[in-house]
């Protein structure tokens, strides 16, 4: 039986402001707050909310039959928290249906997987934590930025404990093979690979409203007929795209949402189901490995990383940024970490591309690739100065890591000692309380025949309940222990 894996990416660009050379060293805030607020509210109104409402309607109408997956970048979630929290609330409502899966991805939507394994792992783990906080479940399948993948990256992902990964079904990688099977990483068979069907995905995300396209207009029944016509043994149809395709790339006036709403019933009529990535990874066996020695992605015709690293400007900016990756990770300064996440976002390098593209590229405030490069390098110059100012630059990374590890261990040891002190203080006060209680009872037993003498002892007993005061003093210490 054929099954469709429908997945949407949600990522929001954090726009950098115009930053001059003379701002270096004086201005440490790099972001265009007005543009960030304007752009995310526009995309939420035109795309995210209408699309998510449509997907919710599809789930409610079709029950457990219809399923969908999402991934959100950490920086995208931060922008949504600030400017469009209703999007996250809607995603939580969708999550409550039990028909939605959330995938892992790098926190920054950056390119760390290409150059720094430790930074890549740290980003993925932080994003998993954030997803779990919002949606109550830790991701088991990973989707890298722009579906970037290679054998080495796949091996790293498998070693992190993920069972599956999404990537591009590029022709130059697959050759005669079909993307409609489950494959596995060539270096680590534990990691299953789900490959995007390029044509079926782009029919919706890129061509749907193009009246010059041979397949225009595209109807849901014809779309499902294409899927049903695949050979019986081709069971997995992976349709991956950005959520902004529904409403931005393909305007709502094109009836894109009506098309989407019709898909579940058309699939059901043809015996085609919907599954989440983890369900497919658990239920369907791999038919073999896919060899990807060189990095691929879902961007541009080449399906590689040349959109971010294709010219000298991009490579210079990339190498300079990641030259301080280990130092940033070791220092672990909150403000530095936040700026690090935003500066890593792959969009910053995409704005510098000189490649022609079939997909329009909005460079925002930048008039040219060189303009984007100059502005970014000014910001990066200030950022690296701040990183180096945290600790002396003559201390190398190994020495710094050793020093900070020692400090961290000492802090943990002090914390343990503090907890032990609180515990012992509480124990001492408990012993004192019991001793005073026993002491208060002794006068009553000493003169049983003389009732008059016994009375003062009885009256004094309440006055001797000093432990009540001590108990109130002990309570803050008990709280400190917790």
Describe the function of each predicted region.
Residues 2-46, 181-182, 187-191, 210-213, ...:
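Active-site and substrate-binding clefts of carbohydrate-active enzymes
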Residues 3-8, 14-116, 140-143, 163-168, ...:
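Short, well-structured secondary-structure segments
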Residues 9-13, 73-75, 107-110, 136, ...:
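An acidic- and aromatic-residue-enriched active-site/binding cleft used to recognize and process polar
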Residues 52-56, 88-92, 121-131, 154, ...:
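Generic structural signal for well-ordered alpha-helices
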Residues 87-104, 125, 137, 158-179, ...:
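Acidic, His- and aromatic-enriched active-site or binding-groove loops in soluble protein domains
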Residues 119-146, 225-240:
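CE4/NodB-like, metal-dependent polysaccharide N-deacetylase domain
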Residues 163-229:
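Loop-rich catalytic cores of soluble enzymes, especially ATP-dependent carboxylate-amine ligases
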Residues 426, 430-482:
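Intrinsically disordered, polybasic Lys/Arg-rich low-complexity tracts
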């Amino acid at each position: 039986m054929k099954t469709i894996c429908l997945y949407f990416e949600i990522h929001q660009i954090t726009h950098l402001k115009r930053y001059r050379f003379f701002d270096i060293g004086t201005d440490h805030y790099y972001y265009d707050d007005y543009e960030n607020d304007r752009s995310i509210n526009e995309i939420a109104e035109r795309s995210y909310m209408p699309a998510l409402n449509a997907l919710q309607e599809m789930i409610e109408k079709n029950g457990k039959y219809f399923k969908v997956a999402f991934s959100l970048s950490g920086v995208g979630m931060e922008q949504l928290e600030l400017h469009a929290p209703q999007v996250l609330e809607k995603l939580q409502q969708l999550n409550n249906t039990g028909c939605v899966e959330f995938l892992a991805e790098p926190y920054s939507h950056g390119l760390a997987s290409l150059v720094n394994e430790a930074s890549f792992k740290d980003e993925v783990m932080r994003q998993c934590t954030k997803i779990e906080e919002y949606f109550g479940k830790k991701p088991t399948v990973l989707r890298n930025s722009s579906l970037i993948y290679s054998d080495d990256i796949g091996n790293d992902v498998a070693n992190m404990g993920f069972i599956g990964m999404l990537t591009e079904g590029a022709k130059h990688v697959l050759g005669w093979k079909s993307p409609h099977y489950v494959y596995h990483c060539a270096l680590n068979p534990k990691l299953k690979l789900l490959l995007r069907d390029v044509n079926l995905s782009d029919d919706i995300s890129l061509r749907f409203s193009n009246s010059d396209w041979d397949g225009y207009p595209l109807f849901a029944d014809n779309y499902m007929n294409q899927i049903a016509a695949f050979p019986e043994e081709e069971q997995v149809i992976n349709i991956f795209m950005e959520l902004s395709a529904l409403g931005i790339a393909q305007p709502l006036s094109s009836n894109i949402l009506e098309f989407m709403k019709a898909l579940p019933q058309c699939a059901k009529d043809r015996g085609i189901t919907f599954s989440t990535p983890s369900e497919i990874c658990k239920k369907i066996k791999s038919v073999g490995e896919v060899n990807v020695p060189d990095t691929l992605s879902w961007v541009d015709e080449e399906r590689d990383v040349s959109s971010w690293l294709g010219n000298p400007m991009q490579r210079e900016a990339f190498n300079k940024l990641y030259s301080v990756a280990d130092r940033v990770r070791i220092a672990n300064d909150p403000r530095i970490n936040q700026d690090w996440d935003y500066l890593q976002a792959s969009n910053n390098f995409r704005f510098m591309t000189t490649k022609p593209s079939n997909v329009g590229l909005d460079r925002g405030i930048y008039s040219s690739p060189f303009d984007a490069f100059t502005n970014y390098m000014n910001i990066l110059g200030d950022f690296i100065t701040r990183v180096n100012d945290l600790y002396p630059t003559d201390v190398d990374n190994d020495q710094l890591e050793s020093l900070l590890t020692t400090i961290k261990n000492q802090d943990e040891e002090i914390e343990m000692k503090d907890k032990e002190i609180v515990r012992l203080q509480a124990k001492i006060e408990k012993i004192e309380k019991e001793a005073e209680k026993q002491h208060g009872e002794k006068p009553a037993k000493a003169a049983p025949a003389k009732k008059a003498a016994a009375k003062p002892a009885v009256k004094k007993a309440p006055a001797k309940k000093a432990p009540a005061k001590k108990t109130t003093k002990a309570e803050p210490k008990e709280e400190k222990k917790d």
